[in-house]
Amino acid sequence: MNVWPFETMLIMTDSEVLFFKKLQLALPEFLIFSQVQLSRIIEPSDEAGQDRRFWFNRVCRQSVDFVLIDTDCQTVLVAIELDDWTYDSQDRQRQDAKKDKALSSAGIPIMRFHAEKMPGIDMLRVDVLEVIRQFG
C-alpha cells in the first residue's frame, strides 16, 4: 500500500480548548502544553533498578491534558487534568489514580478540574499559583 490510511484528528475536545484559553489568560507568564505523554515528563528513578522497563510501561501510554512549564522551557510546575463524564467509570478512575501516583512520586503536583465546573480566570490563577507555591 503506497498511501498509508491516516487522517488528522482534533488534539483537544471543545471543553479542553475552552479550558486551555482560560489557562492562557489566567497564567500568561507560563508555557502551557496540551496532551503531554507522561513518558515525556517523568521516568523511572534509579531506585527502579532492573525494573525500569516495568515502571516505564505502567505510564508510557498515559498523558495529561495540560502541563504548565516555567519560562526556562524545562521545569514542569504542575500537571492539570480536565475531567469529564468519563471520569465516573471505575476503569478511568483506576487509570487516573495510577497517573496521579506516578506524577506524585516524581514530585509533580497534579490538579483536577471538572469540565462542567470550570473556575473563572481569576480563581484559576489563584488556585494554580497556590499549588505551585506549595510544591515549588
Each predicted region: which residue ranges?
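Interdomain/boundary linker segments immediately adjacent to catalytic/signaling cores
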Residues: 1-15
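Active-site metal-binding core of divalent-cation-utilizing nuclease and nuclease-like domains
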Residues: 11, 35-77
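Conserved alpha-helical elements of sugar-nucleotide-dependent glycosyltransferases
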Residues: 15-19, 95
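Short secondary-structure junctions
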Residues: 26-32
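Short low-complexity, flexible loop/linker segments enriched in glycine and/or proline
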Residues: 47-49, 125-130
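Basic, amphipathic alpha-helical patches used to engage nucleic acids or provide basic targeting signals
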Residues: 64-127
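Membrane-proximal, solvent-exposed terminal domains/tails of membrane-associated proteins
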Residues: 133-136
